[in-house]
Design a protein with these regions (language model features):
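Short beta-strand segments
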Residues: 8-10, 90-93, 115-117, 185-187
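PAPS-dependent sulfotransferase catalytic core
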Residues: 1-75, 221-224, 235
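PAPS-dependent sulfotransferase catalytic domain
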Residues: 67-83, 123-205, 261
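PAPS-dependent sulfotransferases, especially Golgi type II membrane carbohydrate sulfotransferases
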Residues: 1-6, 158, 170-177, 196-197, ...
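Glycine-rich phosphate-binding loop used to anchor ATP phosphates in small-molecule kinases
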Residues: 70-103
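Short, solvent-exposed loop/turn segments at secondary-structure junctions
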Residues: 13-14, 25, 36-38, 96-98, ...
């Protein structure tokens, strides 16, 4: 029986590395923890075949058969990618999975996604703090020359590190209810303050056997490459879970974030 497919997606600096480390503690889960090219490859196949002249020439008279060939091939590619895991479930991490959720469910209807969330000001603060530690190296998209407000503004642009996944998150209410039911939203703040309860609830939602993690004794996986991101987005693992540093954000930047993304705070961080 093929393993259950679990995608990890969501916002940057929102605990996806920690989540994958915690998922890997479960004996029935195979989780390598690295960002995976699987989603990018499936999107690339769709783009490539949609422009292929041989494929297009078949659509007029044999659309159903040709489309079935493509669906079977993409389904087989995903299954083949995950088949060697040898566990009940396999985890694949890519920030683009939320953007591609309907494509994923078309070829793997039982797939589920875990969407990582964090206060947007703290996400910006985490990125800015790491930039100050590595200020002699530019970002991969050349944001070092901006002032702090300008850099924050650029990070939230629709094609940048924070803005791009936010667009996918903003589109979630437009998805059919059946699709939304395949999504689990996990706040970083809850994960680091209540890790045992969070993971127990998550394992149950995934339909896996109960398992209690030990936050003070965590096994570590193979480290992910940080140089590809110019050392701006580190993927550190630790053997013990500790509360993260709180980042002090300039009030002007925090106010701008909360004003521009009111929907985010209303949906995921409502006032109690």
């Amino acid at each position: 029986m093929p393993p259950q497919f679990i995608g990890v997606t969501g916002l940057p600096r929102a605990g996806s590395t920690l989540l994958c480390q915690l998922l890997a503690q479960h004996p029935d889960i195979h989780c390598e923890g690295h960002s995976s090219p699987l989603c990018n490859t499936l999107l690339g196949i769709r783009r490539m075949v949609s422009d292929d002249q041989f494929f297009l020439s078949q659509l007029d008279n044999s659309f159903e058969n040709s489309y079935a060939h493509l669906a079977s091939a993409m389904h087989g590619y995903l299954r083949g990618w995950c088949q060697s895991a040898g566990k009940v479930a396999v985890v694949d991490k890519n920030r683009a999975w939320l953007h591609a959720i309907e494509l994923l469910l078309h070829i793997e209807p039982e797939a589920k996604l875990i969407v990582c969330l964090r206060d947007l000001g703290q996400i910006y603060g985490s990125i800015e703090a790491q930039h100050q530690r590595t200020i002699l190296v530019d970002f991969i998209d050349h944001l070092a020359d901006y002032d702090r407000f300008g850099r924050a503004d650029m990070l939230f642009a629709k094609d940048k590190a924070i803005g791009a996944p936010l667009i996918s998150l903003h589109a979630v209410p437009d998805l059919p209810k059946a699709v939304q039911e395949r999504l689990y939203f996990l706040r970083f703040e809850d994960l680091v303050t209540q890790p045992i309860a969070c993971m127990s609830h998550l394992y149950a939602w995934l339909g896996l056997a109960p398992h209690q993690i030990n936050p003070k004794q965590l096994s570590k996986g193979i480290p992910e490459s940080d140089s590809h991101y110019h050392m701006k987005y580190p993927h550190r693992q630790a053997s013990e879970l500790k509360p993260p540093q709180h980042h002090d954000i300039p009030s002007r930047i925090q106010a701008q974030i909360e004003s521009a993304y009111t929907w985010f705070y209303q949906n995921y961080y409502p006032q109690t």
